[in-house]
Design a protein with these regions (language model features):
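Mid-bilayer segments of alpha-helical transmembrane spans in multi-pass integral membrane proteins
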Residues: 101, 105, 113, 137-141
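Short glycine/serine- and small hydrophobic-enriched flexible loop segments
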Residues: 47-51, 112-119
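Divalent-cation-assisted or electrostatically stabilized phosphate/pyrophosphate-binding catalytic cores
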Residues: 88-110, 151-161
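Hydrophobic (often cysteine-bearing) scaffold residues that line and stabilize catalytic clefts
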Residues: 41-42, 106-107, 126
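Transmembrane helix-loop-helix
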Residues: 115-134
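Conserved N-terminal diphosphate/IPP-binding helix and adjacent helical/loop segment
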Residues: 1-73, 77, 81-96, 132, ...
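Short, well-ordered, mixed-charge alpha-helical segments that flank or form enzyme active sites
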Residues: 126-127, 136-139, 144-145
Length: 161
C-alpha cells in the first residue's frame, strides 16, 4: 500500500475536485460520504492492477481509480435509499440527512462524473467495461428488489442476485 500512497493522494484530490458543483447539495452530500473514508479498496485495486500489468500509473490511471470510487459511492447512496438503511460507515445515511431524493440525484451526479473521468482517459475500452459493469450492478439491485420477501428462491436465483 505504501507504494501506491502518492497515487492514492492524487485519487483523493480528484475525488474532492470532481465532487465540486455550484449546486451546494452535491458537494455537501458527496463529501459527507467520501470523507467518511472507507478502505478505498477499489482505487487500490485499480492502481495495483495497472502496476501489475506494467502500467506506469499517472493521471489516466488515477482518473480511472477515481471513476471506480465514484461508481461505488453512487451505488452506496442508491442502496441506502432502496434498503432504507439508517447508517453508512458508522454515520447517519445520507438519505437521513438530506433526504432520499437528494441521495438518489447526487448518486446520479457521481455516476455522471465517473463517466466524464473515464472519457478523459481517451480509452473506449475503459468506458465499455465500466458502463457494462454499471448495468450489471443496476440489474442486480433490481433483481434484489424484485426478490424481496420471496422465500421460494432457488439457490441459483439467490446467487444470481
Amino acid at each position: 500500500m505504501a507504494l501506491l500512497r502518492p497515487e492514492l493522494a492524487d485519487v483523493e484530490r480528484l475525488l474532492a475536485e470532481r465532487a465540486a458543483s455550484p449546486v451546494a447539495t452535491i458537494p455537501d452530500l458527496s463529501s459527507y460520504l467520501i470523507a467518511a473514508g472507507g478502505k478505498r479498496l477499489r482505487p487500490v485495486l485499480t492502481l495495483a492492477s495497472a502496476r501489475a500489468v506494467g502500467g506506469r500509473g499517472g493521471e489516466a490511471v488515477c482518473k480511472l481509480a477515481a471513476a471506480v470510487e465514484f461508481i461505488h459511492t453512487a451505488t452506496l447512496l442508491h442502496d441506502d435509499v432502496v434498503d432504507d438503511s439508517d447508517l453508512r460507515r458508522g454515520k447517519a445515511a445520507a438519505k437521513n440527512v438530506w433526504g432520499a431524493s437528494a441521495s438518489i440525484l447526487v448518486g446520479d451526479f457521481l455516476f455522471a462524473r465517473s463517466f466524464t473521468l473515464m472519457t478523459e482517459t481517451r480509452d473506449l475500452r475503459i468506458l465499455d467495461i465500466l458502463s457494462r459493469a454499471s448495468c450489471v450492478i443496476a440489474e442486480g439491485e433490481v433483481r434484489q428488489l424484485a426478490a424481496l420477501g420471496r422465500v421460494d428462491l432457488s439457490f441459483n436465483e439467490y446467487m444470481a442476485i
